Amino acid sequence: MQTTFVLVHSPSVGPSTWAPVAESLERRGHAAVVPDLTGVTVGGAPYWPRVVATVRAVTPATPVVLVVHSNAGFLLPVIKEGLGDQVVACVFADAALPPRNGLVTTAKEGFLPFLRDLAGPDGVLPRWTDWWDEEDVVAMLPDPAVRVRVAAEQPRLPLDYYTQPIPVPVGWDAVRCSFLWYSPPYDGVAEEAARRGWPVTRLPGLHLHQTVAPEAVTDAVLKLSRKS
């Protein structure tokens, strides 16, 4: 049975951040889906059950390689639990690593003052690309058309998306897990992945490198998941 690559974007951005890799996988004969998580905060907390339901709704009944980016890493354990034995491998692409078990929040305590300063009186944050200087966004998304597309689909998330406790089921990492490292802010995360005994591949770039070099990212995902 063919394996499906389920490419999970950070809820801070949108599905177009994985679309080029999905297209590359399909050109090579692999099945790929990109769940759209841009609506998961509609209706109030907790948000993670909607993430799980959204992923399950678009995932076929095949073996699955879960590929997560950025803060979607914290959601991987509950997504994996929702998909059950379908998941045969997990790839963290410049993504946060959850603990082995317990609870986790999307934002660390030290980052919350920055987020609180950004939030409006209604507790809603600007779009993620509006958090940063324009030159930094241009560096991450150098193609103007891609930059417009990514910016346009971003949701404005409530502050409590970043503070909600997300459960981390025991044994989520019993399958093959690996780390694809793009950017310098994730060097410590890559080191932690290596300490856990995971394969780590370095693909130098910025945080949205899958939109800039989708073929190279696809190569790395296939190798890390042993599907090349």
Spell out what each predicted region is:
Residues 8-11, 69-70, 95, 182:
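Glycine-rich His-Gly loop
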Residues 125-171:
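Conserved alpha/beta-hydrolase catalytic His-Asp/Glu region
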Residues 34-65, 81-82, 105-113:
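Active-site loop/oxyanion-hole signature of alpha/beta-hydrolase fold enzymes
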Residues 2-41, 62:
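Conserved HGGG/HGGXW glycine-rich cap/lid loop of the alpha/beta-hydrolase fold
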Residues 81, 85-87, 91-124, 161, ...:
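Flexible "cap/lid" loop of the alpha/beta hydrolase fold
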Residues 66-67, 90, 179:
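Conserved alpha/beta-hydrolase fold motif
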Residues 67-76:
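Gly/Ala-rich beta-loop-alpha elbow adjacent to hydrolase catalytic centers
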Residues 155-215, 219:
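Conserved serine/cysteine hydrolase catalytic core
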